[in-house]
Structures are given as structure tokens and as C-alpha cells.
């Protein structure tokens, strides 16, 4: 009798155990107990409210092993970008004291209920570039389609969530790094498919930062009052 049942290939079996290990590693990380500044540009405040409350994902909507691998590859590429910029003469600080064991730069407000961690702070650049410092540095990895869109339209139009993060971080980091909001942030986008790099100077948008801060306060107030914010599809 012919057996038409699919039998996992060697690659599928290996990937399955890898994904299981990655998922277990992620599950062991304590969940966030704060509103992350990197997420406040999301269009749906109810979704952000659910994230802050630690609501479990709908069944079948958990991150797949492949998605978790994509996240980790993004972090690895960010580390490469840091090395490349430093090698090119950028004085780029990613941790306090620029030590591997140093704390990541970031901010904490509203009793620790709103927090953010920055990718880096630029203290100096090659003089010929004419980039003002200190400056915030934020790095994202993208597939080719999203990368091309960002190059063509700019991060503010193409990726408003990222633009919101940049503005908020410039505002809240001013207390720790005076002058950081006076200078445009440097946004780096890495094309994961081709290794092309896009760099863009993003001036501080005080109005956008204020709107994101107001949104965070609105979410916290709704949580404290037990109210459910409107859902935006």
C-alpha cells in the first residue's frame, strides 16, 4: 500500500527543534509592564491598551518561529551597522560608558509606566558630513519593498510609527542629553535582502512628540479608570 502521508524532511525536523528553542527562550523573558515608546505610533489605541495590559494573543496569532528568527536577524544586523558606523568615524554610544555590560540608554517617565530604549547616541561624526551632535540614532531593518518605499518617501511618510518613535525619544532624552532635540536624528534603514543602507536626517517634530506623549497618558488614564479605548482597524 502506498503511503501518501507527508513525512517531515531533515530540514523541517531541524527547524522545528530550533523554533521550539527560540520560542522557549522568548517565553522565559518577563513580559513588559510598561508602554513602550517604540509602539506609541501604532494607529489603534485599544491595541496598545491590550499590549500594556498583557492580554494574551488570540489563538493562532502567536509569533511563529520564522518571525522570531526575523526579529533576531534584525538585532544582529543592527550590531553590524553599529560596527560599520564606528569604523567610518562615528563616535556612537549604544550603552552607558560604551561598555558591553553598560545599561542601554533610555528614558522612564510616569512612574516607569512609559519607557523607551534608544539604539544609540552620536557624539561626533566625520567633519565633512556636517551632522550636528549630539544626535539620536535609530536603526531598522526592512525587506526590499519597505526599504525602497522608505528611500522614496522618507521615514515620516513611509513609516510613521518609526517617525513617532524618533520624535518621542528626542523629546524625552533631552533631559539626559541636552541638545539632542536641537539636532536632527540619524535614521538608518538596512535592506535585509540586498544589504543596501539608507541614512536620513530627521528633524525634531515637537508636535508629533507631544501627540504621542498625550496618547500614552490617555492609555494610562483609561487603564486606571477601567475604560476601553476605541478600536481602529
Where are these regions (language model features)?
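Residues in well-ordered beta-strands of folded domains
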Residues: 121, 138-140, 188, 203
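Metal-dependent nuclease catalytic cores that hydrolyze phosphodiester bonds in DNA/RNA
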Residues: 1-136, 143
Amino acid at each position: 500500500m502506498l503511503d501518501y502521508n507527508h513525512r517531515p524532511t531533515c530540514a523541517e525536523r531541524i527547524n522545528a527543534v530550533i523554533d521550539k528553542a527560540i520560542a522557549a527562550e522568548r517565553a522565559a523573558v518577563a513580559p513588559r509592564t510598561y508602554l513602550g515608546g517604540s509602539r506609541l505610533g501604532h494607529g489603534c489605541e485599544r491595541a496598545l491598551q491590550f499590549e500594556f495590559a498583557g492580554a494574551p494573543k488570540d489563538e493562532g496569532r502567536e509569533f511563529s518561529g520564522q518571525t522570531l528568527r526575523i526579529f533576531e536577524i534584525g538585532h544582529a544586523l543592527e550590531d553590524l551597522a553599529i560596527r560599520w558606523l564606528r569604523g567610518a568615524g562615528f563616535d556612537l554610544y549604544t550603552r552607558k560608558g560604551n561598555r558591553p555590560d553598560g545599561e542601554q540608554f533610555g528614558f522612564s517617565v510616569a512612574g516607569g509606566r512609559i519607557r523607551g530604549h534608544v539604539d544609540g547616541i552620536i557624539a561626533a561624526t566625520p567633519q565633512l558630513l556636517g551632522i550636528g551632535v549630539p544626535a539620536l540614532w535609530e536603526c531598522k531593518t526592512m525587506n526590499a519593498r519597505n526599504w525602497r518605499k522608505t528611500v522614496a518617501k522618507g521615514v515620516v511618510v513611509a513609516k510613521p510609527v518609526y517617525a513617532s518613535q524618533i520624535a518621542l525619544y528626542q523629546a524625552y532624552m533631552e533631559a539626559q542629553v541636552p541638545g539632542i532635540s536641537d539636532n536632527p536624528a540619524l535614521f538608518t534603514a538596512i535592506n535585509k535582502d540586498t544589504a543596501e543602507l539608507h541614512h536620513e536626517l530627521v528633524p525634531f517634530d515637537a508636535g508629533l512628540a507631544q501627540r504621542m506623549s498625550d496618547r500614552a497618558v490617555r492609555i494610562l488614564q483609561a487603564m486606571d479608570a477601567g475604560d476601553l479605548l476605541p478600536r481602529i482597524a
